[in-house]
Every structure is written in structure tokens, then in C-alpha cells.
Amino acid sequence: MVKPKYQRVVLKLSGEALAGEDGFGIKPPVIKEIVQEIKEVHELGIEMAIVVGGGNIWRGQIGAQMGMERAQADYMGMLATVMNALALQDTLENLGVPTRVQTSIEMRQIAEPYIRRRAERHLEKGRVVIFAGGTGNPYFSTDTTAALRAAEVDADVILMAKNNVDGVYSADPRVDETATKFEELTHLDVISKGLQVMDSTASSLSMDNDIPLVVFNLNEAGNIRRAILGENIGTTVRGK
């Protein structure tokens, strides 16, 4: 059996990934497909944490554009990520995968508060840890949350799962036929070229902490496992 390239990973899932083709709401059959792949990876002995977005329910930026106070709109987005985290937890545990949800905003009746050392112990014990609530602060994206949590738990890599996009391109391949795919980049390349991989705060944090990123197509079955095994899929963004 091929030895995995990465042992402790942070998987970044967008909220839209849980919504399927509709792009809105939570679709249990779609979640089950994703979770089945996570289970296969878990059975390899991989320590996995998940950061999930909330864009399938609410986006703080859009709320702000419609006249809401930005901080208030962002807090609503953080609560949306908790709903997604609970949906993931329910499906994972139904498939026999031990799971803990940790939130950056305390809501003890439904999840643990985020405590770094406790999160690390859960990972060591083979539990999948789902980080919800973003960073707990407005104005920060869940991409930044992924970079922050990856640094805090000393993850080997961030797996950036994209919907129907198989890597990083010079432009959006869905609208620009001349867009070219990058096989490998650095976080500095991403920032200097203005590539839409993750926001600049997340890229800077990943660069400063030398955390690599693998950007791949979530919609192709088996890609989470392939990324962890180190197969040549998507785009690898090196830490330095």
C-alpha cells in the first residue's frame, strides 16, 4: 500500500459543496457522498480536521452590500457554518466515524468550544474534528480560518476542495478559454499574481507558517484520497 504523503490534514469545504447543484441549502445525499470519501481517508489512519464555510446559507459580504452592518452580517455567516458542521457530524457518525465539532463562538449545548490542545488530542485519538464559526471574528473568511487552524494544530497541508475546478488557473476557466492551469505555485505567486485561490490574508498566513495547499476538484470521486496520497492532481501551492 502507498504511504500517504500527509498524515495530519485540514480539509477546507465550501458551504456550496454541501448544497449540490442548487447552490443553496443543505442536501443530505450530497453530504453523504463527501463523507464517504472522508471515511475512506479516515480508515487509512489519517488525522483530519475540517473547516466548513457557510455560503450555501448566508454570506456576510452580501448582507453588507444590502445595507446590513458588516460585523452583524458576518456573525450570521458564522452561525451558518455551525449548521453545516452539525450536518457533516451527523452524516459522519451515521457512517461510524467518530467526530467532534468545535466552535469559535461558544454554544456548549451543541458543540465544544474551540480549544487548540483539545483539538490536537481528538486528532491523535482518531476523531475527525470539524471547526465551525470561522475565526469567531467578523471580517475574516473561512479560508483564513483554515489557514489559522492548520497552523495551530500543526497540519501538514490544507486541502482546498473546489467545486468543478481542478486546480488554480491564470483566469476563470469557465469564462476564459485561454486560461492556463498551474501545476505548482508558491503562496507568494498567488498573492503577487492576484490569483483567486484563497483571500490574501489566508495566503499570507499560510506562507508565513510554511503550510502547503493542494487545490483540487471535489466533484471527482476519490480526489480527497488522491490528494492525501500525494498523487499529481490539481495544483500544489508550496509554503515557501
Swiss-Prot record:
Catalytic activity entry: UMP + ATP = UDP + ADP
Compartments reported by the entry: Cytoplasm
Keywords: Allosteric enzyme, ATP-binding, Cytoplasm, Kinase, Nucleotide-binding, Pyrimidine biosynthesis, Transferase
GO molecular function, one term: ATP binding
Regulation: Allosterically activated by GTP. Probably inhibited by UTP.
Pathway(s) this gene product operates in, as recorded in its UniProt entry: Pyrimidine metabolism; CTP biosynthesis via de novo pathway; UDP from UMP (UMPK route): step 1/1
Region annotation Involved in allosteric activation by GTP: where it falls in the sequence: 20-25
PANTHER family named among the record's database cross-references: URIDYLATE KINASE, URIDYLATE KINASE PUMPKIN, CHLOROPLASTIC
Complexes and interactors: Homohexamer.
Summary of the function given for this chain in its UniProt record: Catalyzes the reversible phosphorylation of UMP to UDP.
Protein name, entry field: Uridylate kinase
Organism per entry: Enterococcus faecalis (strain ATCC 700802 / V583)
Gene expressing this chain: pyrH
